[in-house]
Protein backbone atom coordinates (compact mmCIF):
# COMPACT_ATOMS: atom_id res chain seq x y z
CA UNK A 1 0.00 0.00 0.00
CA UNK A 2 1.42 3.39 -0.97
CA UNK A 3 1.92 6.05 1.68
CA UNK A 4 -0.74 8.21 -0.03
CA UNK A 5 -3.32 5.40 0.18
CA UNK A 6 -2.29 4.65 3.78
CA UNK A 7 -2.78 8.34 4.70
CA UNK A 8 -6.15 8.37 2.99
CA UNK A 9 -7.20 5.24 4.92
CA UNK A 10 -6.09 6.79 8.24
CA UNK A 11 -8.07 9.96 7.48
CA UNK A 12 -11.08 7.85 6.57
CA UNK A 13 -10.74 5.88 9.82
CA UNK A 14 -10.48 9.16 11.72
CA UNK A 15 -13.69 10.45 10.12
CA UNK A 16 -15.43 7.16 10.86
CA UNK A 17 -14.24 7.28 14.47
CA UNK A 18 -15.55 10.85 14.84
CA UNK A 19 -18.84 9.79 13.30
CA UNK A 20 -19.13 6.82 15.63
CA UNK A 21 -18.66 9.03 18.68
CA UNK A 22 -21.12 11.64 17.45
CA UNK A 23 -23.71 9.04 16.46
CA UNK A 24 -24.28 8.18 20.12
CA UNK A 25 -27.12 10.07 21.72
CA UNK A 26 -26.09 13.62 22.60
CA UNK A 27 -27.83 14.84 25.75
CA UNK A 28 -28.62 18.48 26.48
CA UNK A 29 -30.20 19.94 29.63
CA UNK A 30 -31.41 23.55 29.78
CA UNK A 31 -31.63 25.12 33.24
CA UNK A 32 -33.05 28.32 34.67
CA UNK A 33 -34.07 29.28 38.18
CA UNK A 34 -37.65 27.96 38.12
CA UNK A 35 -38.01 25.85 34.93
CA UNK A 36 -41.12 27.80 33.98
CA UNK A 37 -39.94 30.30 31.34
CA UNK A 38 -36.50 30.17 29.73
CA UNK A 39 -35.45 26.54 30.10
CA UNK A 40 -38.72 24.93 28.91
CA UNK A 41 -38.72 27.42 26.01
CA UNK A 42 -35.16 26.38 25.12
CA UNK A 43 -36.15 22.72 25.36
CA UNK A 44 -39.05 23.25 22.93
CA UNK A 45 -36.94 25.29 20.49
CA UNK A 46 -34.09 22.76 20.43
CA UNK A 47 -36.42 19.80 19.98
CA UNK A 48 -38.00 21.61 17.02
CA UNK A 49 -34.60 22.31 15.43
CA UNK A 50 -33.31 18.75 15.66
CA UNK A 51 -33.75 16.74 12.49
CA UNK A 52 -33.05 13.32 14.02
CA UNK A 53 -34.42 13.56 17.53
CA UNK A 54 -33.60 9.90 18.15
CA UNK A 55 -29.88 10.79 18.29
CA UNK A 56 -30.48 13.61 20.77
CA UNK A 57 -32.02 13.86 24.21
CA UNK A 58 -33.23 17.28 25.30
CA UNK A 59 -34.72 18.19 28.68
CA UNK A 60 -34.98 21.15 31.04
CA UNK A 61 -34.89 21.60 34.80
CA UNK A 62 -34.89 24.15 37.61
CA UNK A 63 -32.33 25.19 40.16
CA UNK A 64 -35.05 26.03 42.70
CA UNK A 65 -37.94 23.76 43.66
CA UNK A 66 -40.93 26.11 43.77
CA UNK A 67 -42.36 25.20 40.31
CA UNK A 68 -41.75 21.44 40.44
CA UNK A 69 -44.76 19.60 39.03
CA UNK A 70 -46.16 22.64 37.19
CA UNK A 71 -46.39 23.37 33.45
CA UNK A 72 -44.46 26.30 31.89
CA UNK A 73 -45.62 29.87 32.50
CA UNK A 74 -48.65 30.90 30.45
CA UNK A 75 -46.76 33.58 28.49
CA UNK A 76 -44.01 31.09 27.62
CA UNK A 77 -46.59 28.70 26.19
CA UNK A 78 -48.27 31.52 24.26
CA UNK A 79 -45.00 32.57 22.58
CA UNK A 80 -44.18 28.97 21.73
CA UNK A 81 -47.63 28.54 20.18
CA UNK A 82 -47.14 31.72 18.11
CA UNK A 83 -44.15 29.94 16.55
CA UNK A 84 -45.98 26.66 16.05
CA UNK A 85 -44.24 24.97 18.96
CA UNK A 86 -45.74 23.04 21.83
CA UNK A 87 -44.54 22.06 25.27
CA UNK A 88 -45.93 19.38 27.50
CA UNK A 89 -43.04 19.86 29.91
CA UNK A 90 -43.62 19.60 33.64
CA UNK A 91 -41.07 21.43 35.80
CA UNK A 92 -38.50 19.41 37.68
CA UNK A 93 -35.42 20.23 39.69
CA UNK A 94 -31.82 19.46 38.68
CA UNK A 95 -30.53 16.24 40.24
CA UNK A 96 -27.03 14.97 40.93
CA UNK A 97 -27.56 12.32 38.24
CA UNK A 98 -28.08 15.07 35.63
CA UNK A 99 -24.40 16.02 35.90
CA UNK A 100 -23.46 12.52 34.66
CA UNK A 101 -26.36 11.87 32.30
CA UNK A 102 -26.13 15.02 30.15
CA UNK A 103 -23.25 16.07 27.90
CA UNK A 104 -24.15 19.77 28.08
CA UNK A 105 -25.98 21.65 30.81
CA UNK A 106 -26.86 25.19 29.80
CA UNK A 107 -27.63 27.97 32.23
CA UNK A 108 -29.45 31.04 30.98
CA UNK A 109 -27.52 33.61 32.98
CA UNK A 110 -24.26 33.76 34.98
CA UNK A 111 -26.06 33.09 38.27
CA UNK A 112 -27.53 29.85 36.83
CA UNK A 113 -24.06 28.75 35.75
CA UNK A 114 -22.57 29.58 39.17
CA UNK A 115 -25.34 27.64 40.91
CA UNK A 116 -24.84 24.67 38.58
CA UNK A 117 -21.08 24.68 39.12
CA UNK A 118 -21.63 24.75 42.88
CA UNK A 119 -24.16 21.87 42.66
CA UNK A 120 -22.02 19.72 40.35
CA UNK A 121 -20.14 16.79 41.88
CA UNK A 122 -16.35 17.05 41.54
CA UNK A 123 -16.27 14.22 39.00
CA UNK A 124 -19.25 15.41 36.94
CA UNK A 125 -18.96 14.75 33.22
CA UNK A 126 -21.39 17.39 31.89
CA UNK A 127 -20.03 20.58 30.37
CA UNK A 128 -21.72 23.54 32.08
CA UNK A 129 -21.94 26.80 30.16
CA UNK A 130 -24.12 29.74 29.18
CA UNK A 131 -26.48 28.94 26.32
CA UNK A 132 -26.12 32.56 25.15
CA UNK A 133 -22.44 32.05 24.34
CA UNK A 134 -23.69 30.50 21.08
CA UNK A 135 -25.84 33.55 20.20
CA UNK A 136 -24.76 34.96 16.82
CA UNK A 137 -25.47 38.46 18.15
CA UNK A 138 -23.18 37.85 21.16
CA UNK A 139 -26.03 38.44 23.60
CA UNK A 140 -24.67 36.00 26.20
CA UNK A 141 -27.18 36.55 29.00
CA UNK A 142 -30.76 35.38 28.48
CA UNK A 143 -32.67 37.51 30.97
CA UNK A 144 -35.58 36.12 32.96
CA UNK A 145 -38.77 37.58 31.45
CA UNK A 146 -41.00 36.40 34.32
CA UNK A 147 -41.24 39.75 36.11
CA UNK A 148 -41.78 41.80 32.95
CA UNK A 149 -45.29 42.91 32.06
CA UNK A 150 -46.76 41.46 28.88
CA UNK A 151 -45.12 39.25 26.30
CA UNK A 152 -42.24 41.45 25.08
CA UNK A 153 -39.65 39.86 27.37
CA UNK A 154 -40.76 36.39 26.31
CA UNK A 155 -40.47 37.32 22.64
CA UNK A 156 -36.96 38.68 23.21
CA UNK A 157 -36.12 35.52 25.14
CA UNK A 158 -37.44 33.33 22.30
CA UNK A 159 -35.28 35.14 19.74
CA UNK A 160 -32.13 34.85 21.89
CA UNK A 161 -32.77 31.19 22.61
CA UNK A 162 -33.45 30.43 18.94
CA UNK A 163 -30.22 32.11 17.81
CA UNK A 164 -28.27 30.34 20.55
CA UNK A 165 -29.66 26.89 19.74
CA UNK A 166 -28.90 27.37 16.04
CA UNK A 167 -25.37 28.50 16.95
CA UNK A 168 -24.85 25.46 19.17
CA UNK A 169 -26.03 23.11 16.42
CA UNK A 170 -23.71 24.75 13.89
CA UNK A 171 -20.78 23.88 16.13
CA UNK A 172 -21.86 20.60 17.71
CA UNK A 173 -24.19 19.10 15.10
CA UNK A 174 -21.38 16.79 13.92
CA UNK A 175 -23.68 14.04 12.67
CA UNK A 176 -24.52 16.07 9.56
CA UNK A 177 -20.81 16.53 8.83
CA UNK A 178 -20.29 12.78 9.19
CA UNK A 179 -23.05 11.96 6.74
CA UNK A 180 -21.65 14.52 4.29
CA UNK A 181 -18.13 13.09 4.64
CA UNK A 182 -19.40 9.55 4.10
CA UNK A 183 -21.32 10.64 0.99
CA UNK A 184 -18.19 12.31 -0.42
CA UNK A 185 -16.26 9.01 -0.28
Labelled PLM ranges:
Residues 3-101, 171-180:
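Conserved active-site segments centered on acidic
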Residues 32, 80, 106-107, 161:
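Hydrophobic structural packing positions in well-ordered secondary structure
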Residues 104, 110-185:
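Phosphate-binding/catalytic loops
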Amino acid sequence: MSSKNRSRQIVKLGVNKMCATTERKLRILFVCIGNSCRSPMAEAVMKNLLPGASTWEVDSAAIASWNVGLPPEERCLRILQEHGLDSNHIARQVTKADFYRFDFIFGMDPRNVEDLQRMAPADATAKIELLGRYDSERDNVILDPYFETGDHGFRRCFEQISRSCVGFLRIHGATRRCHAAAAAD
